[in-house]
Design a protein with these regions (language model features):
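N-terminal "arm"/small-domain region of PLP-dependent enzymes with the aminotransferase-like
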Residues: 1-57, 152-155
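Conserved core of the PLP fold type I
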Residues: 55-171
């Protein structure tokens, strides 16, 4: 949909086109994270219990209990942990906060598709780096690029959609 009200970043976006959606009865579509099994009895019991424990109220907007638990678990100070309303919000804040718009952002050419969307929304130019023949991120390709010439690097680990992880030593 076009509008004179869209920003340049939004006007340049293309609608998401889902992958093939076969219309075969009882087919489990793993590409859309469907599961052939029903929830376990323990999951159903946990859902029922949660429904009776204030689920109708908004949660703590600062997620203080979760933030403290994550900080404690990872041996960090609370100020070193960021909690958001899902990965979309966290990624949007990261793109807005960390990437200088005058420089390109590096990312794998095959990766999580929304990285490019966030970059477009925030006016950040993207520069893709090809995966190697085995569909693996080669960190040497990134190390060969002058760090001062880019806004940063964004890499999903494990990579989406290939599922290949980079070792902590390589990161």
């Amino acid at each position: 949909m076009e509008s004179v009200f869209w920003s340049d970043g939004v006007a340049g976006l293309h609608p998401y086109v889902p992958g093939e959606q076969p219309q075969i009865a009882n087919l489990v579509k793993l590409n859309t994270n469907e599961n052939p099994f029903p929830p376990s009895e323990q999951v159903l019991a946990a859902i029922a219990a949660a429904a009776q424990s204030g689920l109708q109220r908004y949660p703590d907007p600062q997620s203080a209990e979760l933030l403290q638990a994550l900080a404690t678990y990872h041996g960090l100070e609370n100020g070193n942990v960021f909690v958001g309303n899902g990965s979309d919000e966290v990624l949007a804040h990261a793109f807005r906060a960390f990437y200088v718009k005058q420089k390109p952002l590096l990312m794998p050419d095959i990766s999580y598709s929304f990285y490019g969307v966030y970059a477009a929304l925030f006016g950040i130019t993207c520069q893709t780096v090809a995966l190697n023949a085995d569909l693996v991120v080669d960190v040497n390709d990134y190390l060969a690029i002058d760090a001062d010439s880019v806004a940063g690097v964004v890499i999903a680990n494990p990579n989406a959609p290939t599922g290949v992880a980079i070792s902590l030593a390589d990161i």
